[in-house]
């Protein structure tokens, strides 16, 4: 008896546990779904769907979800809202599915199916029959007026542009901007979004691809509000203004079934094949430009598998209840009970009771007002009990839109069903399949890669992060990072074609141009608004004995041997004014004989000092092991900030640097321990007249103005303008995306360095990169006469080179005179 009671108790406990578990499972089931709509008309159709679902709630059984509609104004807005979980699902063109998946982690969970069970469209080029007799092959597409659905649509933009790049002679003008490439190829056209921020990131697109667009309302031209937006809009554009329209194979027949175009015969149009021949509209299987997947329903990948499963079951039931795969759009029973206007701006476009009027705000809050759907019901006989009782049955159709004033709302009108995408296939790559080759192919660049040469491990780390950041946005050419032993090595590798670019100080721009035919093509810009900076001498405020006109016996801190601010300008000043003995043009010996101790990174390297090495030139340097006195970021006292650090903690009396360095490193702007207690007022500028000035007074108290650091590449016989333009293009887009200063652990900034490091690749003071005009892309033209004169004073080889050039010119002049 006791054992029986125990058994009963165990069974009861088990049942309670199972029931409780089921209760908790039900508790965690999602109960609602928010649908993001992309227009006012689509919002109205969605609201009609919510009422239909509420009426037929019993037919959904356990798969029912409370559906609400969230209105946006474009696919991009919906992608943004779903990514931030303000909405749950929307339908997207295959081109937008790529964008949503690649950049916002959205995934496709269901796909539309067309008549016959097909899940693909053919991309076709449509022309008016008998037009364009001069168009015999794809190369003849140049200078034609073209109608595109929108920039980024797979069938209407990506496939045609990709095809013309490979077969139609369309040259890539901008590796990272398809709109510029298309604008240089076609005549005036209409491609909606060609001036949007997304497709015009640096704001220099031509409006050529918006010229045919016809939007009138403010903000309506060349946007989703333009009458020529979408596949149906591109069809209208072809009828009224264009030579060619890129459409889906179903678009023409869909449009000819509408009231607006029902009097136009299908044979008014024909397809343009890739081989130049023409074909009938229905011959799209043999005459198309490529195959693309049908539209998909997407949601956030952050949604659980359980949520996605519920969405699929709910949407599948909607498609079953509210679709008619065999319907005839022209003779649908009860169809006349709907408002079938085609233009949403027509008099009755807002329905019998104006209840989808965007200016009637109450409709946004009262989604279930009965009068709103009065026009969506028809009177039918009750077929269940055989009586003549009249009952209103809703005639809602999920794959029909013309009653709402516009076609293809929520779903394409050519769709007949929805198919579930299995969990393992819920990614944009698997959904797109082979069509993804069109998307990546359109982004190919005639210059495949750009190799950046750096000189330290820290710079290499930053370069790799930069490569990852650029790759995330699919920017081309691909960035490759290469670390070399020194800047001289980088010059040699660039000249030999083993590297492509590097960022050099003005002194290295000189060396690279003189000895290796390198040319500067982009320069950094600091706080002056021009690619230049002031060279300043800085001393401590509590060290009044240090004076610029007499530094004998002092300890000095320099940015590096042969650098402009840290060596060439100050040494030229001292030598030219007779403050130190010149020893001919041997500035290293002059400094070693005059200063007691210094840190001049690179001073004992035979790459930079071909004369006698003086150990005192590195006595203040801080690098350990092989890093000691190296002319790169591995030496802690290298560069402008390194020279300032040498002054702060390394025993220096004076440091030579650019005018922004002190302000960048004091007042808590740097977190490193050596800079924590440093304030602007602790330091002063040394002026050439022996006086001092405040740090901010650099315009009056300086050693001269020098050109900013520059990005260099090959010149001379190896000069390649296509490559240079591709490098300029990549760096321009890179700074647009990553030029900000405010960074965190999860973001990248081109013009910032990690805590503990400074001026990696680019100067931390950089605000932007500026393209150097073509007439300044020689080292001497860029650097200017002041720098060239200073270099001749401090560098024996510079003087010899200049002398040889002058003698050569003199001989040529004499020969000409004799002739």
From Swiss-Prot:
One GO term in the molecular function aspect is:
iron ion binding
Q: Where is the composition biased (Polar residues)?
A: 332-361
Lipid link (GPI-anchor amidated cysteine) located at?
A: 796
Question: Which residues take part in binding Fe(3+) 2?
Answer: 505, 533
- Disruption of the gene: reported phenotype: In the embryo trachea, dorsal trunk airways are tortuous. Failure to secrete verm/vermiform into the growing tracheal tubes, diffused luminal chitin and tube overelongation. Septate junction permeability is impaired, septate junctions proteins Nrx-IV/Nrx and Cora are abnormally spread basolaterally and strong reduction in paracellular septa. Adherens junctions are normal. Levels of ferritins Fer1 and Fer2 are normal.
Topology of this chain in the membrane: Lipid-anchor; GPI-anchor
Residues that coordinate or bind hydrogencarbonate 2: 559, 565-566
| Family from the record | Belongs to the transferrin family.
Give the quaternary structure: Forms a complex composed of septa junction proteins Nrx-IV/Nrx, Tsf2/MTf, Cont and Nrg during late embryogenesis.
UniProt keyword Transmembrane helix, yes or no: no
Which GO cellular component terms are attached? Answer: apicolateral plasma membrane; cytosol; early endosome; extracellular space; plasma membrane; recycling endosome; septate junction; side of membrane
- Signal sequence span is 1-21
Q: Binding positions for hydrogencarbonate 1?
A: 155-156
- Subcellular locations according to the entry: Apicolateral cell membrane; Cell junction, Septate junction
Q: What is this protein called?
A: Transferrin 2
List the Gene3D superfamilies: Periplasmic binding protein-like II
- What is the stated purpose of this protein? Iron-binding protein and component of septate junctions that form the paracellular permeability barrier in epithelial tissues. In an iron-dependent manner, required for septate junction assembly during epithelial maturation in embryos and mature septa junctions stability.
Task: Identify the species of origin.
Answer: Drosophila melanogaster (Fruit fly)
Keyword terms, alphabetized: Cell junction, Cell membrane, Disulfide bond, Glycoprotein, GPI-anchor, Ion transport, Iron, Iron transport, Lipoprotein, Membrane, Metal-binding, Repeat, Signal, Transport
GO biological process terms, alphabetically, are: iron ion transport; septate junction assembly
